[in-house]
């Protein structure tokens, strides 16, 4: 038991090496002593180290080295930054709240979206309008009511020009969140 504790202490560096321990408690036979010293000598003698000559690359070797052809990739202009012309508008007739993903993906890509919620129930239509309001707020766009249940979601670079009609009380109350 003491031997195991002593070996652990030596391993952790809390005690001196094995040579003091062996000389105090154990007297090895002459054959064992010779083999132990022979093992220690083998451990101490490192292998000879050779220096490796480094070759410096010649200018001809660098020219002969294969290089893959490089084709530059031109980045397409982002549709959000494009203000020169409007190419498309998406009209979506959602049937359930699950269609919100399609609305969000189109608007995120910079495409104005006309959302017609006439085919939806009132509760789901309100949820979808709330989602759309958050979407345009997060992407700095705008949302405008076209008719009672039809809305236009436009990105920040699109300006909508139209009549500034006052909406009647019955139309305004449908999506009034106050």
Curated annotation (Swiss-Prot):
Ranges of biased composition (kind: Basic and acidic residues): 19-45
Superkingdom field: Bacteria
Gene Ontology biological process: division septum assembly; FtsZ-dependent cytokinesis
Cellular localization per UniProt: Cytoplasm
GO annotation, cellular component aspect: cytoplasm
Stretch list, region Disordered: 19-65
UniProt keywords, alphabetically: Cell cycle, Cell division, Cytoplasm, Septation
Annotated signal peptide: none
InterPro entries cross-referenced by the UniProt entry: Cell_div_SepF, Cell_div_SepF/SepF-rel, SepF-like_sf
Quaternary structure (record): Homodimer. Interacts with FtsZ.
Function text: Cell division protein that is part of the divisome complex and is recruited early to the Z-ring. Probably stimulates Z-ring formation, perhaps through the cross-linking of FtsZ protofilaments. Its function overlaps with FtsA.
Family: Belongs to the SepF family.
Descriptive protein name: Cell division protein SepF
Annotated organism of origin: Arthrobacter sp. (strain FB24)
